[in-house]
């Protein structure tokens, strides 16, 4: 194991693919709550790190405010980036709690940015944090709806941005991951619990 690029004190979200070296973030993480934040080493953007250690900005804060979770489509032709909503105690402007999608070109350049979804369901904001793709390109996204009963858990969206399913949980969910020998068990990391359920699909294979 070796360091590709030193970004900051903490572990950023990352997404990798066979022809797309890891996408890296530099969010305001890595410090215990209640303590003064450390000096940010790089602006809050999405960076592409290649094996040589070179960093290229691929998505700016202006394009996606407070970028957080990111993932590729199964064919690595789309990159999805979550804009984290402003949380308690945040002093910055914060994002809108939505998701944007970009086309990934053969040269690894991003283009054609579009709003994928604003995560509004029945007038309730089901803000995301982490997300994963299944083999059909559907996106399984964590849902943080605060105290709105029945809206925390997981939302599922098809590649066109249409809501096609929900998993309701009694807690806010921060992240999700497919696991098990067949990648057909969805693990959901909630505020105080870890939930798991078998689903009728499989998680997309890693790069």
Protein language model annotation of sequence segments:
Residues 2-41, 82-94, 144-148, 197-200:
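Short, conserved, GDST-rich strand-edge loop motifs in beta-rich repeat architectures
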Residues 135-137, 143, 154-161, 165-171, ...:
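Short leucine-rich amphipathic alpha-helical surface patches
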Residues 43-66, 103-123, 153-169:
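Blade-edge beta-strand/turn elements of extracellular beta-propeller
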């Amino acid at each position: 194991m070796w360091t590709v690029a030193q970004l900051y004190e903490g572990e950023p979200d990352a997404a990798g693919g066979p022809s797309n070296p890891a996408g890296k973030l530099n969010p305001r993480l890595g410090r215990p709550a209640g303590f003064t934040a450390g000096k940010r080493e790089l602006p809050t953007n999405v960076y592409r790190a290649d094996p040589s250690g070179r960093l290229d900005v691929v998505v700016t804060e202006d394009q996606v405010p407070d970028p957080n979770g990111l993932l590729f489509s199964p064919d690595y032709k789309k990159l999805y980036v979550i804009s984290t909503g402003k949380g308690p105690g945040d002093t910055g402007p914060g994002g809108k709690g939505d998701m944007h999608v970009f086309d990934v070109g053969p040269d690894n350049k991003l283009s054609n940015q579009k709003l994928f979804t604003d995560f509004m369901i029945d007038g309730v904001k089901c803000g995301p944090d982490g997300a994963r793709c299944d083999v059909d390109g559907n996106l399984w996204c964590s849902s943080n709806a605060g105290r709105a009963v029945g809206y925390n858990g997981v939302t599922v969206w098809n590649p066109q941005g249409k809501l096609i399913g929900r998993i309701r949980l009694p807690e806010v969910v921060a992240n999700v991951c497919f696991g098990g020998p067949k990648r057909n068990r969805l693990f959901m990391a909630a505020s105080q619990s870890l939930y798991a359920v078998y689903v009728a699909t499989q998680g997309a294979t890693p790069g």
